[in-house]
Amino acid sequence: IRTGNTGKVVMPHDHHHVLATYHKAGEKEVQMAIDAAMKAHKEWSELPWVERASIMLRVAELLATKYRYILNASVMLGQSKNPFQAEIDAPCELIDFLRFSTFYASQVYADQPYSETGILNRMEYRALEGFVFSLTPFNFTSIASNLNMAPAMMGNVAVWKPSTTAIHSNYFLMKVFQE
């Protein structure tokens, strides 16, 4: 989406070096995002959780392999982290969030109330009505992912507003999510 109202992503350690130009969303674009999320809500929330979990695990695999180095480079340039900090934040912690969250979701869904003989007590989980709004931080790419993906794993839809100072790495996250 191009609005014509643009901003620049610069390196924190070299403000003269422009990494990217992005289009700022206004009220119209925010409403479009909400409408798109609500349109996807029924299908996404009714998708079996195992299928949603498999998508999350696929994202983790892509981050561990195909996109690991581009995400590291993006975090180093856009958030001024050294290679060790970038590796911990971007792929490692992000992959852990996705894999552990999938495991913990399976435990949540498996946990059922006690049933007396001849009675079946059962808990059925459902997504929230509406959407989750994620306003993600400037300093941790992994948290930017987790604030969106954890609710999505549980069947919710999310509207994501990345920090303007972390748009570079968050753009690559979005590309991985789309794949």
Task: Briefly describe each language-model feature range.
Residues I1:
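Active-site loops and adjacent core secondary-structure elements that bind or stabilize anionic groups
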Residues G4, V10, D14-Y109:
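Glycine-rich loop-to-alpha-helix module at the N-terminal edge of alpha/beta enzyme cores
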Residues M76, A105-E179:
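Rossmann-like NAD(P) dinucleotide-binding subdomain of oxidoreductase/dehydrogenase enzymes
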